C-alpha cells in the first residue's frame, strides 16, 4: 500500500491579476506553480524546481469578442489549465484526474507547453472556438535557439458547446516532433494526430458520457 499526493488533482498556488481597458477590453496575467502536498516539491514540470511551471501567461481580450493568450500553458486535451477543454466541457465522467478514472487513462492528453499562443472566441449560441500553437513545447529539451526544425511544435483546434443540460467537444491536436532523436522518438519521426469527440447529457440524476 502506498499513498501518493496529487493523483486526483494537483495542489497549486499562484498569482492572478486583471486590469480593465476601456469599457469592454481587459488584460490579465496568470502565474501558477504546482507542488506535491506531502513534500512541497515543485511539480507539473520535468525541470526540477521550475517555478510557475503550471501556467505563466498574459491574456489580452475584449468582452463579447474573445481573447489571445501568450506564454506557458496546457493544451486542450486535459483538465489542467485555463484552456483545458475536458474540464471546460465536463468530459471527465468521474470528475477526476486519476488515470484509472479519467480520460487521460484512455485518450491521448496534451502537455504543458512553453512558447504557446491561444486564440479563444467568446461563446456564440453556446459554441466556443479555440486555436493553439506552441513553437517549442519544452525549452529545456528543445531550445528555441536550435531552429524551427529542431524543436517540437504543437498545433490544435477545438470547438466546445454548452447547452442547458448537455455539453459536447470536438478537438484536434498535432504534435510535430523535433528533427532530432529524443528518447522514444527517432530521427525524423512523423507527426502524431489526435482527434477527440465527446458529449455529455444529464437525464435527471443520471448523466451519460460518450467519447
Which role fits each region the language model picked out?
Residues 1-136, 151, 160-167:
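Outer membrane beta-barrel
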Residues 36-40, 77, 134-146, 150-153, ...:
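Sequence/structural signature of outer-membrane beta-barrel proteins
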Residues 118-120, 128, 138-139, 197-200, ...:
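Non-transmembrane, interaction-prone segments in cytosolic or luminal domains
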Residues 150-211:
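Detector for outer-membrane/organellar transmembrane beta-barrel domains
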Amino acid at each position: 500500500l502506498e499513498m501518493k499526493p496529487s493523483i486526483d488533482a494537483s495542489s497549486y498556488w499562484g498569482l492572478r491579476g486583471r486590469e480593465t481597458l476601456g469599457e469592454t477590453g481587459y488584460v490579465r496575467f496568470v502565474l501558477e506553480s504546482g507542488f506535491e502536498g506531502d513534500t512541497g516539491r515543485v511539480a507539473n514540470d520535468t525541470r526540477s524546481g521550475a517555478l510557475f511551471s503550471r501556467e505563466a501567461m498574459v491574456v489580452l481580450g475584449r468582452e463579447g469578442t474573445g481573447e489571445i493568450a501568450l506564454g506557458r500553458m496546457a493544451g486542450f486535451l486535459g483538465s489542467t489549465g485555463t484552456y483545458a477543454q475536458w474540464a471546460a466541457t465536463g468530459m471527465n465522467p468521474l470528475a477526476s484526474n486519476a488515470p484509472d478514472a479519467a480520460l487521460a487513462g484512455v485518450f491521448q492528453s496534451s502537455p504543458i507547453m512553453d512558447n504557446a499562443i491561444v486564440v479563444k472566441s467568446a461563446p456564440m449560441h453556446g459554441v466556443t472556438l479555440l486555436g493553439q500553437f506552441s513553437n517549442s513545447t519544452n525549452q529545456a529539451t528543445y531550445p528555441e535557439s536550435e531552429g524551427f526544425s529542431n524543436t517540437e511544435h504543437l498545433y490544435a483546434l477545438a470547438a466546445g458547446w454548452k447547452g442547458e443540460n448537455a455539453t459536447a467537444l470536438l478537438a484536434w491536436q498535432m504534435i510535430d516532433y523535433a528533427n532530432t532523436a529524443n528518447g522514444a522518438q527517432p530521427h525524423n519521426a512523423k507527426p502524431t494526430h489526435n482527434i477527440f469527440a465527446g458529449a455529455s447529457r444529464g437525464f435527471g440524476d443520471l448523466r451519460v458520457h460518450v467519447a
